[in-house]
């Protein structure tokens, strides 16, 4: 995209009723009195962030029956709208065995009002999920959870990020 700008300045000569007018000129072109055009190159970057909190079921220790609440945010750090946004959430126990979320990830909202699957430039969408700790998962002493997000630009370029890799793409 681009932004085009042109200004017309008008002033009166002091002590007279005569107007003086001049139209702005882009100094980078040979044409006289033409618009100044600034080209804006499209770029697409998303960042996935995930936080977790545990709701203890009353025994004071993290373990079987407790709920791990996940909040996943996906921020469009680029300057183009992204569509087709999907969230993938991989959950494993301490031995690498696959686990399934008890719920989610589910779309909670976006700070600029977009619906699920769309991110405007600069917009952040929030997703929620939770996992109820099972005896088998607790026996491995840890639960590993990674979220990834994938979306598409208008030109069908793929944009993705993983919540724990430190690299926004």
Descriptions of predicted regions:
Residues 1-169:
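Exported/extracytosolic protein signature
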